[in-house]
Amino acid sequence: YDTAPGDLWEQERIHALKEEVEASGLHISGIESVNIHDAIKIGLPERDRYIENYIRTLENLGKEDIHMVCYNFMPVFDWTRTELARVRPDGSTVLAYSQKAIDALDPEKMFDSISGDSNGYVMPGWEPERMAKIKELFTLYRDVDEEKLFSNLKYFLEAIMPVCNRYDIRMAIHPDD
């Protein structure tokens, strides 16, 4: 979906998307992903404004009979892989992650490395406009350790769960988190 993290998903746009999908004979039963703004993950003072937009987005999804939202709470990137096409012994390819490779790269080199393997495909969380701010994001996340990130996730979930319960929305966190 083309709405920036933290921005409201308007009900009219959700409805139009749902109609377009259903006109093709399909049904939307869930959404991946209503992206979470970094201010929420970091715990910045402005996070409540973005949480309010998230709550209103959930209400709009619920009103459109969409009852599952997959999301992630990963810092900096939507997801991180160090290889997009690691060759397996049988010749197939898989995504791969190496902490050693992450530790050895600075953010710009990492972006260049991943982008070079992407064949021009822009991956979620790796958009060029986001990458222009990557050093700033790394600085903002510098003091967010595992405990702080989990505390911010708990704060977020406690804020959104009442509306999830009201609209029977199941929140499905990405398994990498």
Across the structure, where does each feature detected by a protein language model lie?
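N-terminal pre-domain/capping segments
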Residues: 1-168, 172
